[in-house]
Curated annotation (Swiss-Prot):
Induction summary: Positively regulated by the two-component system NreB/NreC.
Organism: Staphylococcus haemolyticus (strain JCSC1435)
Gene transcribed to yield this protein: narT
Location within or outside the cell: Cell membrane
Reported function: Probably required for nitrate uptake under anoxic conditions. Also possibly involved in excretion of nitrite produced by the dissimilatory reduction of nitrate.
CDD domains tied to this protein: MFS_NRT2_like (cd17341)
This protein's record includes keyword Ribosomal protein: no
A GO-annotated cellular component: plasma membrane
Keywords: Cell membrane, Membrane, Nitrate assimilation, Transmembrane, Transmembrane helix, Transport
Membrane topology: Multi-pass membrane protein
Alphabetized GO MF terms: nitrate transmembrane transporter activity
One of the GO BP terms on file: nitrate assimilation
Protein name: Probable nitrate transporter NarT
Transmembrane segments: 14-34, 47-67, 69-89, 97-117, 139-159, 161-181, 205-225, 246-266, 277-297, 302-322, 330-350, 359-379
Length: 385
């Protein structure tokens, strides 16, 4: 299993994920600056913030499958080359339509998540997969990097130049992956149709997809809507809002490998049930909060639970679907990405309908309860003997 290469490839792929997520999430933290030059209404804003998630979710299935066919090296390399185009186009954007188009293709940066979660387990023994995938998942910190750094840099050199600077970083990592990516990565050539046929009859795939829809969806959604939400609802300064959003993302990211470790040492489903109970409480807190202090407590609770939950779920995926890991990773991670697409739209709709976003957070709690019920069913069926 090429374990001797594991540490190096894990590091390279994790850093590549950081860069991919930096590009994927670049619009949201810069939107307070972009909106000064490009006029957008609330409806357009919610679409612009959510649209990178569409392609970033849909492509996760073919990217996971392709990783098993041609290896992570070439999927990462081609993705970085493709990303150069929407980044360049975004730097020239002058209309909402241009923002939407560039944002759509920035989704490639989010889709590469399924590359590593398919490739990395090949280099490690089963009792280390949870930790390894958790470390790889820390590449999500790329979202926080953009949240922390993009706003203050944009305040100095302008948002267009800030966006264009990403071209250099992406080009460097395309070169690094071309040179150092593992061309001898073990391949798994199981026909996609047969994988889907086997997966479609396994209820665990649907449960894991629902759980990740909530945990990773919360991670993505909060990262997308928090900067503008904090500015518009609490009067927070643009840079401060970016920092607060970055803290949410960083906390969830650094706790992801802890979730993987907990999944390696204990029953991952049981730990996940506890995690979701706390997440439900956090969602209820957000649903009743009207003060920044209470809202912060709710956000931090969601961040902690989302991070741990992400790590726990991707401990379970390879253990349940060893031979269909590429397709399973792609489907589950796709659902997680889609989980980040809907909340910003729901929040905008609910706020316009009721004058408050509180109901949207209560809906998160309801989804958490539904997921908890399915966890109880799986635990009873698989472990309670």
């Amino acid at each position: 299993m090429y374990k001797t290469k594991g540490g190096f490839q894990l590091t390279l792929q994790t850093l590549s994920l950081v860069v991919g997520f930096m590009a994927w999430s670049i619009i949201s933290p810069l939107m307070p600056y972009i909106s000064q030059d490009v006029k957008v209404n609330p409806g357009q804003l919610s679409i612009i913030l959510a649209i990178p998630v569409i392609l970033g979710s849909i492509l996760r299935v073919p990217f996971g499958y392709l990783t098993n066919i041609i290896g992570a090296k070439w999927v990462f390399f081609c993705s970085f080359v493709i990303l150069l185009f929407p980044i360049f186009f975004l730097g020239q954007a002058q209309t909402p339509g241009m923002l939407m188009l560039s944002g759509f293709f920035l989704g490639v940066g989010g889709a590469i998540f399924s590359v590593g979660v398919t490739s990395v387990p090949k280099y490690f023994s089963k009792d280390k997969v949870g930790l390894a995938n958790g470390i790889y998942g820390m590449g999500n910190i790329g979202t926080a990097v953009s949240s922390f750094l993009a706003p203050p840099i944009a305040g100095i050199i302008g948002w267009q130049t800030t966006v264009r600077s990403y071209l250099i970083i992406i080009a460097i990592f395309a070169i690094l992956m071309f040179i150092f990516g593992d061309k001898n990565e073990p391949k798994v050539k199981v026909p996609l149709a047969s994988q889907f046929k086997k997966l479609s009859s396994n209820y665990k795939l649907y449960y894991l997809s629902l759980w990740y829809f909530i945990t990773f969806g919360a991670f993505v959604a909060f990262g997308l809507f928090l900067p503008n939400y904090l500015v518009n609802n609490f009067g927070i300064d643009k840079v401060d809002a970016g920092i607060r959003s970055g803290v949410f993302i960083a906390l969830a990211t650094f706790l992801r490998p802890i979730g993987g470790i907990l999944g390696d040492k204990f029953n991952a489903v049981k730990v996940l049930m506890i995690d979701f109970i706390i997440m439900i409480v956090g969602a209820v807190i957000l649903g009743i909060s009207s003060h920044i202090a209470l809202f912060t407590i709710g956000c931090l609770t969601i961040s902690i639970c989302a991070g741990l939950g992400n790590g726990l779920i991707f401990k379970l995926v390879p253990s349940y679907f060893a031979k269909e890991s590429g397709a399973a990773n792609g489907i589950v991670s796709m659902m997680g990405g889609l989980g980040g697409f809907f909340p910003p739209l729901v929040i905008t709709y609910v706020t316009g309908l009721t004058g408050s976003s509180h109901l949207a957070f209560i809906l998160l709690a309801i989804f958490g309860v539904l997921a908890f019920i399915t966890m109880g069913h799986l635990y009873k069926k698989e472990y309670a003997k």
